[in-house]
Amino acid sequence: DTEGANYFRYPDSSANWREIYPNGYRPISEGENRDLQIVAGARGQWGDWDYDASLDYGRNDFTYRLRNSLNASLGPGSTTRFKTGDFAFAQTVGNFDLTRVFDAAGATHTFGTGAEFRREQYRTHAGDPASYAAGPFTDRPTGSQAGGGLTPQDEADLSRNVASVYANVSSQFGDKFSTDLAGRYEHYQDFGSQWTGKLAARYAFAPAFALRGAVSNNVRAPSLSQIGYEATSTGYDAAGRLTQGRLLSVNNPIARA
């Protein structure tokens, strides 16, 4: 678990009620982190090939809380502890690899190929209603101090499948020269397909001196948290009217309009 201090709110600040904190206050952030991982696998030989198969499940849950805080717009009766949101990410990965060593064209080659399937899930849940509420005191800031909570409209529930196949060959030509060639095809359910590859070579002029060069390309798909995270901030303008600002995900209909 983690804990952090935020900046100090002075006694005469609009973000404070003296009835709660006569001398001002410093909100404390609390993070509760929980991890789970289960792995199963098998390896062995299949004819001239070595195989390695695995199934991996991992999950991370994070709860964000505040203590020694308040929602000034709720008045002197505001609570001082809040849960501002829950975040969860889970991933299941199945993997199967084959490897074989053989000699050809005056070199020793190590050839590998395999396939992978990945299932990703991302969820967020709203915080306590008091953590994002806009109370009756319109001249005071809304939401819990040191970070307003996620609202129900900010909640996300996303998942996707990712499948890939790949192959690589490493070749050793004598004692000095070696090459590596690799390629990978990956398909994201929500992002599309991509090809990536790499070519590298190394020449050893002496035991203590060698040159190596490589060329490759890479594509990184955005994570589900980058795609799906949303947040809302609520406040009052100078006339006491309720206003709202939102951080929208890329798939939100408002953002795509």
Go through the PLM ranges and name each one.
Residues 1, 51-55, 109-113, 179-181, ...:
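Transmembrane beta-strands of outer-membrane beta-barrel proteins
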Residues 1-8, 14-23, 27-47:
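Transmembrane beta-barrel wall of Gram-negative outer-membrane proteins
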Residues 2-6, 40, 100, 134, ...:
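Short, intrinsically disordered, charge-balanced linker/junction segments flanking boundaries
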Residues 59-63, 68, 119-128, 189, ...:
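Surface-exposed extracellular loop regions of Gram-negative outer-membrane beta-barrel proteins
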Residues 159, 163, 186-196, 218:
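Solvent-exposed loop/turn segments connecting transmembrane beta-strands
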